[in-house]
A protein has these predicted regions:
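Conserved acidic residues
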Residues: 49, 122, 150, 174
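A short, gly/pro- and small-residue-rich
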Residues: 39, 43-47, 162-181
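A transmembrane-helix-recognition feature enriched in membrane-embedded lipid enzymes
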Residues: 59-60, 193-244
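Conserved beta-alpha
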Residues: 62-139, 147
């Protein structure tokens, strides 16, 4: 799906009167590398109602590997989706912000009110870094339900945010999106890479230079693991084609 198609789908889901919600994931090199070694995480991603190509290298890999379905690989970047959904929101779209710090959430809410006047933020929650207890999760569900939200933006970091959007869709009639760093980018607390770096697949270098402590493991382990997985899949596809 293209960016526009993804945005339209999210906006439509918000109005569906169904008992269960929808989950949207954004797959990048680290996501795929992590899923290859964590079966529970892989199941969470695969259970998503929509999984978008968040990273340019993922798009390249999709185009390089044989695809019997003839898919059209496009980058659908989490921050771009969040921005576009906010821009196209009406009074009926009610947004809830889950994740990050209280300061960042306050900045983000103010930016949304300033830049997207039609987007209504009905609640926000900055949970503790540790895993939430069952009681805390139940109380979180109640807060979201009481707010009337139909779109929940989740920025808890990978992999926690992907598990959370799956949990939310099973509990509430909301569309939950695991958008990660979009909170920081839109709030202005972390600078975003220039467009040319995003298109060239070098955005990770920019982000690493800005947050080396947090992102070193992600890139030093995740990127090589992703490349290894792609090459292994390519070789396996070639062997299969030769045998046939």
């Amino acid at each position: 799906m293209s960016l526009d198609q993804t945005v339209d789908q999210v906006l439509r889901w918000a109005f569906k009167s169904e008992p269960l919600g929808h989950a949207v994931h954004f797959a990048n090199a680290y996501t795929i590398a992590l899923a290859s070694q964590d079966a529970d995480y892989a199941e969470a991603i695969n259970s998503g109602d929509l999984v978008c190509c968040d990273g340019t290298p993922v798009v390249w890999a999709g185009k390089w590997l044989p695809d019997p379905h003839g898919s059209e690989w496009q980058r659908v970047y989490g921050p771009d989706v969040m921005t576009a959904v906010l821009e196209k929101s009406t009074a009926r779209h009610k947004h809830y912000l889950l994740g990050s710090t209280t300061d960042t959430l306050n900045l983000l809410r103010n930016k949304i009110l300033q830049n997207y006047p039609n987007a209504k933020v009905v609640g926000m929650d900055s949970p503790p870094f540790r895993n939430a207890t069952e009681q805390e999760l139940s109380e979180r569900n109640e807060r979201i339900a009481d707010s009337g939200a139909n779109i929940v933006w989740v920025g808890l970091g990978t992999p926690k945010q992907d598990f959370e959007v799956e949990r939310l869709k099973a509990c509430l009639p909301v569309t939950a999106l695991a958008v990660g760093a979009a909170f920081d980018f839109l709030a202005g607390t972390v600078p975003q890479a220039p467009p040319w770096m995003q298109k060239s697949g070098t955005e990770w270098l920019y982000r690493w230079s800005k947050e080396p402590k947090r992102l070193t493991k992600r890139y030093l382990w995740g990127n090589p693991t992703f490349v290894k997985l792609v090459v292994q899949q390519r070789l396996a596809d070639r062997r299969k084609a030769t045998q046939n």
